[in-house]
Amino acid sequence: MQESIACGKTVLGKQFIGVVAALAFSSGMCAQTAPPQQPEPAKSQKAAPAPRRDLSGIWDVANTMEGISPQGVKSHAPFTAWGADIANNVYKPGDGPRRVLIGRVNDPLDSCDPAGFPRNLLFELRPFQVVQTPNQVLMLYQYQRVWRVIWTDGRELPKDPDPRWYGYSIGRWADDYTFLVETVGLDERTWLDNAGDPHSSELRVEERYVRVDHDTVELTVKIDDPKAYTDPWLARDKLHLMLQPAKTDILEMICAPTEAEAYKKAIADPATK
């Protein structure tokens, strides 16, 4: 029987309806039940030197649970009044310090909305592939089977971009081993993480990828959103990514609307009664 991955759960064809009656469809449960893919250990004690200006390949987080981050970011800057109102009164997460009962959760992921950026870096960061072209860097993610385009042709960020789920990104090499990415134009409907931490349309995200050696990259993600937070802060700080063998098969982790509806009828709706 063909096996697929749906929202982080292993689903065997029509057996899903029975499974969903026993397992919560919430994003937190998806994170906990997804089959872990442990990065393969390096074949040698000392990795080869890093290639210059090259992130090509398939990468995975060295510590799987650190990549999944089911309870949200470890810490963040204080909320502004606007950010606190959204976090405490509007968003109803199923995980983290402000989690609510399952029948009250309004996480967009439970309706199969896109995770968006940077949530796809802060929750369920699974294997992803980097493809470099002369004018772009493409990042292809396992979770929700989505991709990002990072322009490297020297263009500037747009001044007033239309909001996008994954924003508008430009990148450049700060040196031979450090790739910097800036992203703006992010849709306010997305959450930052599983804990329902919000962001506004003023959000600016900076990513720093440092190629330490042939097999290792350190990822740092900086959040700068003056409407939602009092100060810029680091959502990821030197997260270790490991290069995977070229034969690695990136799985499907797709949220199917039919499965989300089945979960809603079997679990979420009865929980509100």
Where are these predicted regions, by residue range?
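N-terminal secretory signal peptides that target proteins for export/translocation
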Residues: 1-13
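PEST-like low-complexity, intrinsically disordered acidic/proline/serine-rich tracts
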Residues: 2-3, 18, 30-273
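A general, composition-driven signal for non-globular sequence regions
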Residues: 8-9, 26, 47
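Bacterial N-terminal signal peptides
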Residues: 13-28
